[in-house]
């Protein structure tokens, strides 16, 4: 990039090498038509490295459940639940014109924020938030200063297996094999603990937007599996934690699913819940989840450490742990047909949104063997609580984690 200064501090962190761009919104509306703030489709143009980038975006459909709610607590411990209108939301998926394999996941809430990928390179874009200016920064992940250089990992263990490779899917088209898979959908609840609430300066609006950005990316990640991700609830433990969130990730993973079963599921139906915490788990672990437990009334859960300010990295971590719930093992570098994918035991320095052939086969096997009913929405009543896939409680070796 043309060097724009010594460094710049953005929401994503301190960036040393970036290019200032000025996205121009293209509005092909009929004369006299009123332009909405967040149209179903939007197009922007800007220049990167002297090349014109045409960003075509479509509003993310089905990002929120019809009964989407947000819950926080009063000083005396009462639950306060609201049902905000989310129809005119600001989250998009898209592509770069004239690049066949391009992808984009963008929030247009306050300027443009997100990432796009062209010719195998991932670029991030973020508003500079300058008064009377549409200036944005475009940069690569390698140019973001890392506060912690340790390798982040998943705490899950698994047994390596041999797989027959299948064609890697694109972001739009499913392979013939995947087209035979049933359309599935995961109703996801996110729970924010007190440490994460404090980390974001008790700004519930900021936390909510941050989590919605991440789920929007998750939605794109799982699309090639014919699996839809729908956000149903964000709950904030803004006054105090309702479990003891320990630095030992395995201990926290035992406590959170129990709370989900005894408290959460009695008032709000969901297929899966993830705890979001700023507690620094022991060692290199940044995520942990039970393996093959999607739809289990207790163990369909995972825990996520808020280890990065970059939405893509956090979305990949969340997708990784959800992948374990869906029966996916860690990728074996020597047996899986993917250089950089979602399910390695260690978080890649070059984040990927692609599942390997191993993960595809694991998911297919999970659907066939476990027959998880809760993610096949058309066959279930909307007011029923998900039932267990198996009558047996998961063993310790069915716990999988992520290290970064």
Curated annotation (Swiss-Prot):
Keyword annotations: Disulfide bond, Hydrolase, Metal-binding, Metalloprotease, Protease, Secreted, Signal, Zinc, Zymogen
Cellular localization per UniProt: Secreted
UniProt main location, coarse: secreted
Domain of life assignment: Eukaryota
Annotated signal sequence range: 1-6
Binding residues annotated for Zn(2+), in chain numbering: 320, 324, 330
Alphabetized InterPro entries for the sequence: MetalloPept_cat_dom_sf, Peptidase_M12B, Peptidase_M12B_N, Reprolysin_adamalysin
Enzyme Commission numbers on file: 3.4.24.-
Positions of the UniProt region annotated as Disordered: 385-404
Segments passing through the bilayer: none
Any Pfam family the entry gives: Pep_M12B_propep
Record-annotated disulphide pairs: 295-374, 336-358, 338-341
Residues covered by the Peptidase M12B domain: 184-379
EC class of the enzyme, as a word: hydrolase
Biased composition (Acidic residues): 394-404
Propeptide residue intervals: 7-177, 379-404
Cofactor note text: Binds 1 zinc ion per subunit.
Cofactor: Zn(2+)
Tissue specificity statement from the Swiss-Prot or TrEMBL entry: Expressed by the venom gland.
Positions annotated as active site in the UniProt record: 321
Family, per entry: Belongs to the venom metalloproteinase (M12B) family. P-I subfamily.
Function: This probable venom zinc protease is not hemorrhagic when 3 ug are injected onto the back skin of guinea pig.
Protein name: Snake venom metalloproteinase H5
């Amino acid at each position: 990039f043309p060097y724009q200064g010594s460094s710049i501090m953005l929401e994503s962190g301190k960036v040393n090498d970036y290019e200032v761009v000025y996205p121009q919104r293209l509005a092909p509306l009929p004369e006299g038509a009123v332009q909405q703030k967040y149209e179903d489709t939007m197009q922007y143009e800007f220049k990167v490295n002297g090349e014109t980038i045409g960003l075509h975006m479509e509003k993310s459909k089905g990002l929120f459940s019809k009964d989407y709610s947000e819950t926080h607590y009063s000083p005396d411990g009462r639950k306060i639940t609201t049902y905000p209108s989310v129809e005119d939301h600001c989250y998009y998926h898209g592509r770069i014109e004239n690049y066949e394999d391009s992808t984009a996941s963008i929030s247009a809430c306050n300027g443009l924020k997100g990432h796009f990928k062209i010719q195998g390179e991932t670029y991030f874009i973020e508003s500079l938030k300058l008064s009377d200016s549409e200036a944005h920064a475009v940069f690569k992940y390698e140019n973001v200063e890392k506060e912690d250089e340790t390798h982040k990992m998943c705490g899950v263990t698994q047994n390596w297996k041999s797989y027959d490779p299948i064609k890697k899917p694109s972001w739009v088209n499913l392979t013939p094999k995947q087209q035979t898979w049933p359309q599935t959908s995961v109703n996801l609840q996110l729970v924010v603990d007190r440490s994460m609430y404090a980390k974001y300066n008790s700004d519930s609006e900021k936390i909510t937007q941050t989590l919605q950005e991440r789920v929007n990316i998750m939605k794109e990640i799982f699309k090639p599996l014919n699996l839809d991700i729908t956000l149903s609830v964000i709950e904030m433990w803004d006054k105090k934690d309702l479990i003891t969130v320990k630095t030992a990730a395995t201990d926290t993973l035992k406590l959170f699913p129990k709370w989900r079963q005894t408290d959460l599921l009695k008032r709000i139906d969901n297929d899966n819940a993830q705890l979001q915490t700023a507690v620094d788990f022991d060692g290199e672990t940044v995520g942990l989840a039970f393996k093959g437990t999607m739809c289990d009334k207790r163990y369909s859960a995972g825990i996520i450490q808020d280890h990065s300010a970059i939405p893509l990295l956090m979305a990949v971590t969340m997708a990784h742990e959800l992948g374990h719930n869906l029966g996916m093992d860690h990728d074996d570098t020597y047996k899986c047909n993917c250089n950089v994918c979602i399910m390695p035991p260690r978080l890649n320095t070059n984040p990927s949104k692609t599942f390997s052939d191993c993960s595809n086969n694991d998911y297919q096997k999970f659907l066939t063997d476990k027959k998880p009913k809760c993610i096949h929405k058309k066959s279930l009543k909307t007011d029923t609580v998900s039932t267990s896939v198996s009558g047996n409680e998961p063993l310790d070796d069915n716990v999988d984690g992520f290290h970064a």
